[in-house]
């Protein structure tokens, strides 16, 4: 899959890794993807005449001359306020659900980011461990029939994460935007019947943050609304002026996305997972974090910044607690327990931690503590944690880059 030779030039294989947060694409053998594009796509239904020309470099046009759907890609494009722009993703539960949007995204990746002929490059494509046979066949058909690629390899992202960390056997704990999963891998193969999933992931924590601010009566004002702001003292009402040139008819999907981006910034800057089960007195004694919102409102956070992410590990902290929902350490131990006895002992020594949600401060330390204190001493757990945040976010892509360069 390394690419072969075309016209005297060696052509590298391409590696595609798709997640709910972003689509990573690049060349086999590289240390990181060439491009990291949001998995959300904007579109606008608009009427045009035959003389209209499209000048937006982040947009593609399809449809008739009388009416067409204009697509908008990439972070600058989808973050720009536009009238009637809806945001959609092509994924559901980690699997491709909207094939038309997926095709538009691939067109955009090839033309704007990779700038190459698809027919000249083999492709390694990651997939969710629970992906269905019909979806695998449809993706294979799309890549061969539309993009005319010379070779195609579809492989589960948990296996790639294991390879990226030098392991062929272990449990991959992947906590991303949409869900968290524990996937056991043995000699490079996923143990399907032992996959355990949990909805406690990035979007869950983002919603916990939103609920927290609603309870505190703190209004969330995204960047795009603000023309200017004044400095105010801690916890005083914000003094800011609204932009006068905000387009009309901004859609709910776009406004929700902009608020979500703001909450994700708060999450990365302020939240921390405690070393042990939440204790308000201990949390209050920890150093506070000062955080300022885009409109100038600012506050100090003490125990609350530990309480919000605590639900990832102690599900009793969730309001309306559902007893079937498992925390991070529980899904790891449950996954191992579902494996055959013959391979069970080989898994705890390689618990591979990956996914953007694991970058919350204190996440890996708490996971390690819970696994070592809440399980039998005979089960010696060892966390395999990539050295940098980039490696942790891009583990499946990096594993694919390594594998595709060797084949």
Stretches found by the model and what they are:
Residues 1-407:
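C-terminal region/appendage detector
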